[in-house]
Amino acid sequence: MIEPDRLISAVSGRERDEQLDRAIRPLKLADYIGQPSVREQMELFIHAARGRQEALDHTLIFGPPGLGKTTLANIIAQEMGVSIKSTSGPVLERPGDLAALLTNLEAGDVLFVDEIHRLSPIVEEVLYPAMEDFQLDIMIGEGPAARSIKLDLPPFTLVGATTRAGMLTNPLRDRFGIVQRLEFYNVEDLATIVSRSAGILGLEIEPQGAAEIAKRARGTPRIANRLLRRVRDFAEVRGQGDITRVIADKALNLLDVDERGFDHLDRRLLLTMIDKFDGGPVGIDNLAAALSEERHTIEDVLEPYLIQQGYIMRTPRGRVVTRHAYLHFGLNIPKRLGPGVTTDLFTSEDGN
């Protein structure tokens, strides 16, 4: 099974790390690094809503974990000058749970629902009129004497976040006036995030040190900040406290995070496909059995970054590794993937 404290997991970790994440989280769009299209659009929408003195349209934010969906929700509330109340889909088990939140909102407030794709159908039904008409339908009594009453709600903004937009029902998705997708970050933006976080934490970091951490952060700010904290530990114990490129490289190698941001679980998945299934195609269930992992763990945790980086492909016949995987491990490339090239273990993937 995947370790709950996996260093390069994009899922929120221990409470201590979550507290530090909150401390370094930007509060304004001006401080929000990366996602230029999303930032520009949200700045426009927020400015327009403020000018009309209206609540911002309901907003759906989706993308892989750790890219800043919660951060963006908090920024929206901050920029609109309103309060934010946060919850998650699994927590809202009954309509009464949702009603209690909605009836305590002030005009313009933001209700943030993480993992909104996990709302139960009965709760989702209550949410529809609340989103569309700012009304809450409540059943009073039981049996033949039961009756429905409508409560007016102040205009509010629902911000929903999900890693699996495809699991949202069409009626719920259609009620969001603003839909934003967050993409993996490039190394330059991640290096800026690392440098900013280091400054907030009072750390001395060289640009090359920030770039080394960013390079191995899998395009994810949450992972970049987690790696920064572990490199800080290494620098304080085995260095002079400053984070240089050499210190970052030594620390991350010690932590078993390679130059591509892969850890032992990523390498195990790739090598299992190469050694046991001849590079694929292999069905997801067979792969899960070979790795002793759950199917959804492979699909949601391990695969996205490997696919995004071009090491794995999904095909109608199953998963296959690409030539990049063979090059990464210094293995012969099968003829079906191109010329039979043998790479030395210490030769980089670009041949240098």
UniProtKB/Swiss-Prot annotation:
Residues 186-256 are annotated as: Small ATPAse domain (RuvB-S). ATP binds at I24, R25, G66, K69, T70, T71, E132, D133, F134, R175, R222. It is found in: Cytoplasm. It comes from the Bacteria. Residues 259-352 are annotated as: Head domain (RuvB-H). Residues 4-185 are annotated as: Large ATPase domain (RuvB-L). GO terms for molecular function: ATP binding; ATP hydrolysis activity; four-way junction DNA binding; four-way junction helicase activity. It is an enzyme of class 3 (hydrolase). One of its GO terms (cellular component) is Holliday junction resolvase complex. SUPFAM superfamilies: P-loop containing nucleoside triphosphate hydrolases, Winged helix' DNA-binding domain. Keywords: ATP-binding, Cytoplasm, DNA damage, DNA recombination, DNA repair, DNA-binding, Hydrolase, Nucleotide-binding. InterPro entries: AAA+_ATPase, AAA_lid_4, DNA_helicase_Holl-junc_RuvB, P-loop_NTPase, RuvB-like_N, RuvB_C, WH-like_DNA-bd_sf, WH_DNA-bd_sf. ADP binds at I33, G66, L67, G68, K69, T70, T71, Y185. It catalyses: ATP + H2O = ADP + phosphate + H(+). GO terms for biological process: cellular response to chromate; cellular response to selenite ion; DNA recombination; DNA repair. DNA binds at R295, R314, R319. Its EC number is 3.6.4.-. Mg(2+) binds at T70. Has 3 domains, the large (RuvB-L) and small ATPase (RuvB-S) domains and the C-terminal head (RuvB-H) domain. The head domain binds DNA, while the ATPase domains jointly bind ATP, ADP or are empty depending on the state of the subunit in the translocation cycle. During a single DNA translocation step the structure of each domain remains the same, but their relative positions change. NCBIfam families: PRK00080.1 (NF000868), ruvB (TIGR00635). The RuvA-RuvB-RuvC complex processes Holliday junction (HJ) DNA during genetic recombination and DNA repair, while the RuvA-RuvB complex plays an important role in the rescue of blocked DNA replication forks via replication fork reversal (RFR). RuvA specifically binds to HJ cruciform DNA, conferring on it an open structure. The RuvB hexamer acts as an ATP-dependent pump, pulling dsDNA into and through the RuvAB complex. RuvB forms 2 homohexamers on either side of HJ DNA bound by 1 or 2 RuvA tetramers; 4 subunits per hexamer contact DNA at a time. Probably part of a ruvC-ruvA-ruvB operon. Does not seem to belong to the SOS regulon, no LexA binding site has been identified in the promoter region. Belongs to the RuvB family. Homohexamer. Forms an RuvA(8)-RuvB(12)-Holliday junction (HJ) complex. HJ DNA is sandwiched between 2 RuvA tetramers; dsDNA enters through RuvA and exits via RuvB. An RuvB hexamer assembles on each DNA strand where it exits the tetramer. Each RuvB hexamer is contacted by two RuvA subunits (via domain III) on 2 adjacent RuvB subunits; this complex drives branch migration. In the full resolvosome a probable DNA-RuvA(4)-RuvB(12)-RuvC(2) complex forms which resolves the HJ. This is Holliday junction branch migration complex subunit RuvB. It comes from Pseudomonas aeruginosa (strain ATCC 15692 / DSM 22644 / CIP 104116 / JCM 14847 / LMG 12228 / 1C / PRS 101 / PAO1). The gene is ruvB.
